[in-house]
Amino acid sequence: MNKAVIISLLALSLFSCEKKANVYTLHSGNTSLTVTNYGARVMSIVTPDKYGIMENIVAGHKTVEEYVHPVGERFLGACVGPVANRIGGAAFEVDGEVYHTPINDNGHNTLHGGFKGVDNLIWDVVSVCDTAIVLHLLHPDGLEGYPGNLEMTMTYTLTSAGEFRIDYLATTDKATPVNFSNHPFFCLRGEGNGSVEDYLMQINASHYIPIDAESIPTGEIAPVDGTPFDFREPHLIGERIGMEDQQLINARGYDHNWCIDKTTDGVEFVCHVSDPVSGRFVEVLSDQPGLQFYSGNFFDGHEKGSNGNPLGFRSSIALETQKWPDAVNHPDFTPVILKPGEQYTHTCIYRFGVSEE
């Protein structure tokens, strides 16, 4: 195995199942990506700014142990599922049977799969090379209340075009909800540096999904017209985030799903975020119908990044491509039930660069 790829190896005992958690670094051009198979987490993405200075642009930790025993954000850099985002009431129905999932959010709901979601499991490494890693996980029938043995394969690739590409594939032997996403927190000036309120954001969406006080979708698919959620043209994130808008109050800022204006079933433009200070930008492309944009409203500086800087309020953002939240309880939302004989697929591309301005 390539010595430039594997940079450390350690053993963990997690949930009574001993596996090895490895750390890998991939390289392509002037971009490097460090991941661990514990939760299929992104630990760092190093890219140049407009002056050529190389810096990690996602919030992370130096060691796997810090992810196993987090002092703050549990989902930092993780793959989340089997159902990303929230399940209202921690329950859903499939084929006439009601299933109950763990309550780990606001005292009533399930967030990102539960306590033992895929972010808290050690994935098997199928293959690894300088620019790609393939991970596999079996999520057994009944774990955290989800039906079916869910077989998952995920490929992380650094392309020659300076892109971080994620490809998901899943199958099941019993009908079950499936909606994976990834949770890197982007800090385009480096960990703990500056505020995302200064970032310029554009989202390809004419509608978004309003939420209640527990961040559960109300069932409405609302137009962004005339609201602080209209990013069809670029706006500074901080321009309207402090408005007296009930939706912003509910989430303490932005933490909502935008319904992407898709024209095909393939990979299309989702959003573009740029930082005027570093010149860095990240552009997101995906084949999924939704984007959860979270403006880092609950970071408080208690947790530190891999560079030792505190991860403060709104110092990073999450851009999560996915199907719509709580879709399993909303028949009018994009369907999330995977049946035997079907394949769940999902492609997300994070394209990095430096603005010419």
Named regions from a protein language model:
Residues 2-8:
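Sec-dependent signal peptide recognition
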